[in-house]
Amino acid sequence: MGKKDKTEIKVEEENKEKKQYKKKKEREELEIPKGIDPWKPLELKRDDVGKRVLYDDSSFATLFPKYREKYLQEIWKLVENVLHEHGIECKLDLIEGSMTVTTTKKCWDPVAILKARDLIKLLSRSVPFEHAQKVLNDDYNCDIIKIGGFVRNKERFVKRRQRLVGPDGSTLKAIELLTKCYVLVQGNTVSSIGPWNGLVQVRKIVEDCLKNIHPIYNIKELMIKRELEKDETLKNENWERYLPQFKKTNQNKKKKVQKKKKDRDAAPFAPPQLPRKEDLAMESGEYFASEEKKRRKIQADREAKHAESDQKRKDERQKSQIAPAEKDRSTTTTTNTSNIQDTLSNIKNNLKNNKRKEAPTNNADDFVLKKNKK
């Protein structure tokens, strides 16, 4: 019996190996035709599902700001019509400022309630209805990125958020074209709608932008990747050698820690320990005195301090009452007379030096023309 069991086991192992070989061969023979995505989810239709799928109601609710109230009132009928196709009810509460989405017995897609939740979230974040309704399709998903906690300084935050949008929205348009996603920057959030691959790229660009990495670097990288995807020879190769590697130009300005020079004259050992209050009291004998003596001494010291402070206050008051010292008039008169004498002597010297020169005597004959002698 034992021998038969061994032979049977060997036969089973051989059959397994043959089956595995056949499977590998079949896989190699199978070829996916071009233009078909094998990872694309299959569409779920109403005919593929039974009459009733959900046996319990589930609901989601979100709040919306006051400035969205008017727009939501205008498009709410469209929202109801779109969600009614999936068997979902929606309510708009203007008093509380909330939107609620609930499943019904007619709901045949269990994922539809999650898609409806994303729809009302996007509508509350100022996304227009034309773009928000795309979330209900299987090919589209949404991602709401919170950017409020990346930067503390408000001015710096506004500057980096504007950098993400770019001049006339050019940077945002480039991101949308490369990632195949719709992107909207609103307040402290960035909403994006598109395929999963594009949403991951959008999140990376947004987070890097708020970490002070310009979006142009990521945009360049995406452009190079898109060109490399077209080349069939480079599809299965590593692309790191083709991608640009940007280095930081702004270095962190850290203060250099200066090493302290050792003083040669400094003592090699630590200074002696200072005495405590108890030690000083023991030396003076106060430590062994009775409590009454200690109290009397404290009182005497306190009175002496009060007396000293009172004396200082009296001296300051008396200073204001003391008349200021008069100036000596004799010194002022002597200085004035000496100044007057100096000025007079200077004037006399100037007159002597600048005497008028005597004018030359002029005769009448000097002004008459003399006849020329023949």
Swiss-Prot record:
Which GO-annotated molecular functions does the record name? RNA binding
InterPro entries under this entry? KH_dom_type_1_sf, KRR1-like_KH1, KRR1-like_KH1_euk, KRR1-like_KH2, KRR1-like_KH2_euk, rRNA_assembly_KRR1
Q: Where is the composition biased (Basic and acidic residues)?
A: 1-18, 290-330
List each copy of the KH domain by range: 141-211
Q: Which family does it belong to?
A: Belongs to the KRR1 family.
| RNA-binding found in the keyword field | yes
Q: Which GO terms describe its cellular component?
A: nucleolus; small-subunit processome
UniProt keywords, alphabetically: Coiled coil, Nucleus, Ribonucleoprotein, Ribosome biogenesis, RNA-binding, rRNA processing
Q: What domain of life does the UniProt record list for this protein's source?
A: Eukaryota
Q: Report the locations given in the UniProt record.
A: Nucleus, Nucleolus
Q: What GO biological process, any one, is recorded here?
A: rRNA processing
| Disordered as annotated region, ranges | 1-26, 245-374
Q: What is its main location?
A: nucleus
Function, as annotated: Part of the small subunit (SSU) processome, first precursor of the small eukaryotic ribosomal subunit. During the assembly of the SSU processome in the nucleolus, many ribosome biogenesis factors, an RNA chaperone and ribosomal proteins associate with the nascent pre-rRNA and work in concert to generate RNA folding, modifications, rearrangements and cleavage as well as targeted degradation of pre-ribosomal RNA by the RNA exosome.
Q: Does the keyword Iron-sulfur apply?
A: no
Q: Compositional bias of type Basic residues: which residue ranges?
A: 250-262
The protein, known as: KRR1 small subunit processome component homolog
Q: Which residues form a coiled coil?
A: 1-34
Could you describe the subunit structure of this protein?
A: Part of the small subunit (SSU) processome, composed of more than 70 proteins and the RNA chaperone small nucleolar RNA (snoRNA) U3.
